[in-house]
Amino acid sequence: MLAAKSIAGPRAFKASAVRAAPKAGRRTVVVMARKNEVSESYAKALVELADEKGKLEAVHADVDAVAGLMKENAKLSALIMNPVVESDKKRAVLAKIAKEAGFQQYTINWLNLLVEKDRLSLVPEICECFEDLYCQMTDTQVATLRSAVKLEQEQQFLIAKKLQELTGSKNIKLKPVIDSSLIAGFVVEYGSSQIDLSVRGQIERVADQLTKEMTAKLS
């Protein structure tokens, strides 16, 4: 029986998880077909190095944090992506962020390499590719959890544990999204599947049933 660990903390950037302990030894990474082979190569190199050094979870948290910052901080993203801004300034900004966040040295070296090779514009895609490879290596199913209000950590943990049973995945990673249109309850989306336990979903199902019944009576 898989033991469910506690939900990930702030550095997970709004992503909760139930994780299994990683297997010892280096794991094989198979890169899925993507548009940018350069992004693939940077992500693959980092994920393999982190796994080899036994720092995969820590580096994954770092990359998750970088991806979150790029999405949520428009000014930072604009500065990083701007080809006119000098490399030294970009390196200094990233160094400050890395120090405050407590990034692993492997992550810092990776960011510096991207500055040196003028590849910072690929950061979002590299982060996506890293996430894909990480999930592949750790048998992690990523699921989007949409709810009308923010769910408590314990609620998220229980949902993740249930999904673990339904999917058979060793690990489940929830990405919470607030959607006030749901009224109450939540919707979980993973792969091509969806579990709708929202009030809006219930209303729509009732309305659909009533429509069918009325149509049947009139026909």
Swiss-Prot record:
Keywords: ATP synthesis, CF(1), Chloroplast, Hydrogen ion transport, Ion transport, Membrane, Plastid, Thylakoid, Transit peptide, Transport. Coiled coil: none annotated. Gene3D superfamilies: N-terminal domain of the delta subunit of the F1F0-ATP synthase. GO terms for cellular component: chloroplast thylakoid membrane; proton-transporting ATP synthase complex. It is found in: Plastid, Chloroplast thylakoid membrane. Belongs to the ATPase delta chain family. In plastids the F-type ATPase is also known as CF(1)CF(0). This is ATP synthase delta chain, chloroplastic. The gene is ATPD.
